[in-house]
Every structure is written in C-alpha cells, then in structure tokens.
C-alpha cells in the first residue's frame, strides 16, 4: 500500500457547467485542396465514452464526455482558472440542477488551451443535461505526495483514483504501474 498525505490535502467544492461546442466558424482545407469542417472541442459529446478508441473519429480534438467551464466568456480568468487548477483526474462530479440532478460522474482531466475540465458521465445522464445545468466537483488532489517516493511528483490526481490504480512496490525502490493500452508514438 502506497503511503500518502491524502488525509492532509485540501478539498474544495468547485462549480462549473457544460460549455457549448466550439468552432472556428470557417471551413478548413486539407493538403489536397478539399474543404472540410469537423466537430472539435467543447460540448456534451453523447457518443464517446471512456474506453472508446481515441483514433478513427471524424473529429479534431474532440473531448469525450462533458466539457465544463466556470466561465465561458473569460476562460483564462477567475473562477475558471481555479477550476482548472483544483479539479483533478478522478474527482467526483455531481449534477446539482436540471433533469440529471443527483447524477454522479468523474473528472477525466483537462484540455489545455480550451481551458475545459472534462467530466465522464454515462450516456443516459449526458442526454438529460443542458448547457445551463450546474455541476459540483469535489476538487482534491493538488499537493498529493508519496511519502516513500519523494522524487515522484503527483499533479492533478485524486487520491482515491491513485488507490484504484493497483500500483505495486517492486524491488529496488521501484513502482510497478499496470498498463492497459500501448499508444503508438505517431498517429
């Protein structure tokens, strides 16, 4: 069992809402001169879930799940920057308004540049959400440390997710981290 400082990290309540899908508002042109327009960042993406293939979708930088923001008009300012920093992979996210009120999901991570926090919910929950709904994230994980491995730095990781990762201590002060998929270096 990995020893951590999980009992001493700060936990915030963070509020966000789904952000509508974004577009450049223009068509792009491929290397053969063909115009195209593809779905991109943001939105409530109904048909992509955790575990689906990352490649092969007719999209560009599509975010699976629900792309959330605290402020769609000022994504790089407070309170959205706090949402970005304090929400961590594995944090519990609860819908607190609308038809999906009470539904629980989990933070997948962030999409830098778009300043979105991406939350995974089952499809049936996503189908009930609207862009005015409110979601509360229990932000915890920043400051998490491994007591016996101070050279390993943890960022954006909920301690409960760390515990579920089945990481084992191996000989020679090493950790064995299970891997489920090998992603090729070139797409």
Identify what each model region corresponds to.
Residues 5-187:
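Conserved mixed alpha/beta catalytic, RNA-binding, or beta-rich assembly cores of soluble enzyme
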């Amino acid at each position: 069992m990995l020893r951590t400082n999980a009992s001493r990290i700060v936990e915030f309540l963070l509020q966000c809402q789904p952000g509508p899908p974004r577009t450049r508002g223009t068509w792009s042109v491929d290397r053969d001169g063909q115009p195209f327009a593809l779905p991109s960042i943001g939105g409530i993406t109904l048909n992509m879930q955790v575990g689906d293939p990352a490649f092969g979708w007719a999209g560009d930088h599509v975010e699976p799940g629900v792309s959330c923001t605290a402020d769609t008009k000022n994504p790089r300012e407070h309170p959205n920057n706090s949402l970005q920093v304090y929400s961590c992979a594995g944090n519990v996210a609860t819908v607190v308004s609308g038809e999906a009120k009470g539904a629980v999901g989990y933070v997948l991570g962030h999409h830098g540049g778009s300043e979105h926090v991406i939350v995974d919910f089952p499809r049936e929950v996503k189908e009930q959400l609207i862009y005015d709904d409110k979601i509360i994230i229990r932000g915890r994980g920043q400051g998490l440390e491994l007591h016996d491995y101070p050279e390993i730095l943890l960022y954006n990781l909920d301690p409960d997710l760390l515990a579920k990762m089945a990481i084992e201590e191996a000989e020679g002060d090493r950790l064995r981290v299970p891997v489920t998929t090998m992603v090729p270096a070139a797409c």
